[in-house]
Amino acid sequence: MKISGIYPNQQAINVNHKKNNQIQFSGWQNIESKCLGIFDLDNTLMHGSHEEIKKIIELVSGRNGKKVYATGNTLEQVLSKQKKLALEGIDLPTPDYLISNNGQFLYENIDGFLVKNLEYETMLKNKTHFESEKVLEKMKNFANIPKYSFNDQEYNKLTQMNNFEAIKASDPDFYKSKITHYLWSPSDFMSEYFIASGVNLKEFQKDIQKELADIGIKTKFIDNLYPKKIMDKCPESILLQSHSLRRSADESMTAMFLCPADKADGVEYLKRKLNITYKEILMAGDDDNDISMAKLAKKGAHFIAVNNSSIRLQAYCMKMKNKVSSVFMSQFEGAKGILEGIDKVINRSVNN
């Protein structure tokens, strides 16, 4: 495979290996191993040219690998973005597996169609007993206890807002609270909330975890800090619920997802299903919801943080780099950053 400019070592690796072994190199670390290439989509794999994406897919496939997309998007959103890219002349191939909704659902490519893996869904249900409606009912009461409600001064500010009645109408169960429920990717496996600036997230998680445990539900928490530029693009209903009293001083907004799983759960399931070792798993991401995958580097998996990663992901990966050698901080954004990281992993395996 011809590899261009900024990855000068890759072509030499392929040529030298074929010369010495006369077989195709498989896996990221070992000869004749299966491997996984797992990529976030928005601002990661999809943030690149047709040629860059093509190179990444070829590198995974050429090493006896399965290509996996791990995203916060729903299946429908992924298919829509795939079509949009095609109109721009960019081919985003259908993956072998899709981990969607931040790990809540897993789809398998069967004859070109992404089919929901019911075994994964059943496993999560049996393990957590998670039901979004039950979580929401519990949250309606929990969010309005004094600890998580606006104080008198804050509530007075709220009532003085020009759009107070619209806020109240859009948020009838939560408008007095520092916590509000919203709908972005509705699912039985996810309950979505905005958490006001100033709320202690660790305390909140501990408090609601206990409340849900009382009704037999286990939950995970995925929090994302969305900057102003993203929040400003949201529909009107979301803007009403993420008003100024809930935002940070820089107008960013913390979202908290209560769910039975995260992206790492999907990765762990595929590892078991396909009988693949951690060192043969390579992942890349850019956002807070990719931290769960980055944590798998502790077990030997490889994680690439692309250069346009969120502040939280960068901070976590910088800390991890001091402990493990399988975390790579790329100099490049998106797909180009993935290629740089893959080159680093392959070089390490050859040199070792």
What are the roles of these predicted feature ranges?
Residues 50-184:
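Active-site phosphate-binding/coordination module
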Residues 82-88, 206-212, 311-322:
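Short, aromatic/basic amphipathic alpha-helical patches
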Residues 39, 101, 284-286:
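Active-site flanking residues adjacent to catalytic metal/cofactor-binding acidic residues
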Residues 31-50, 294:
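Asp-based phosphoryl-transfer active-site loop
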Residues 256-352:
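Mg2+-dependent phosphoryl-transfer enzymes with acidic/Ser/Thr/Gly-rich catalytic loops
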Residues 149-284, 288-296:
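Conserved acidic, metal-coordinating active-site core of Asp-based
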Residues 1-29, 352:
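Non-Sec secretion/translocation targeting segments of pathogen effectors
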